[in-house]
């Protein structure tokens, strides 16, 4: 996972911890917790099943030189990622997916708006963070076990 994505997910995890303490009865139905659940489903199941699926294509929205970028759409959120299906490592062919960025509630999808996730992400790409090179994305990525973080919340704040 790219640090840009990790930062957004960590913020959501912190909010989930607060909700677990302050609103335990509403925890499962809280919009932030539902958003976190959707992200978990996307990165652990839906996207890895077939990252090349046409539903993840974004066309020329970011410009023709950024067509390799994929995105998952859910509500007014966009999760941007890149994948490569033929990376060789130790004579084994690997499929690598790098989850790069997710907009927050300050930049919900609204076509034409300067804070629209596509507009924000395009500016980020032009500024070089995240990098356009897949190799650089992989180098910048960090190991982040989201499931471990969720288990920590459950242990810290049992029902």
Where are each of the predicted segments found?
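Basic, Lys/Arg-enriched alpha-helical interface segments
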Residues: 1-76, 84-159
């Amino acid at each position: 996972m790219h640090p840009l994505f990790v930062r957004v997910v960590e913020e959501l995890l912190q909010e989930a911890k607060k909700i677990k303490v302050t609103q335990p009865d509403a925890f499962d139905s809280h919009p932030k917790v539902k958003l976190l659940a959707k992200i978990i489903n996307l990165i652990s199941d839906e996207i890895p099943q077939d990252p090349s699926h046409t539903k993840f294509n974004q066309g020329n929205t970011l410009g023709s030189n950024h067509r390799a970028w994929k995105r998952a759409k859910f509500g007014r959120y966009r999760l941007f990622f890149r994948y490569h299906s033929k990376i060789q490592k130790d004579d084994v062919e690997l499929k690598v997916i790098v989850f790069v960025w997710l907009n927050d509630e300050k930049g919900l999808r609204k076509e034409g708006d300067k804070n629209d996730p596509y507009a924000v992400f395009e500016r980020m790409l032009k500024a070089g963070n995240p990098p356009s090179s897949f190799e650089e994305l992989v180098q910048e990525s960090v190991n982040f076990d989201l499931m471990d973080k969720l288990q920590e919340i459950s242990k810290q704040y049992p029902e």
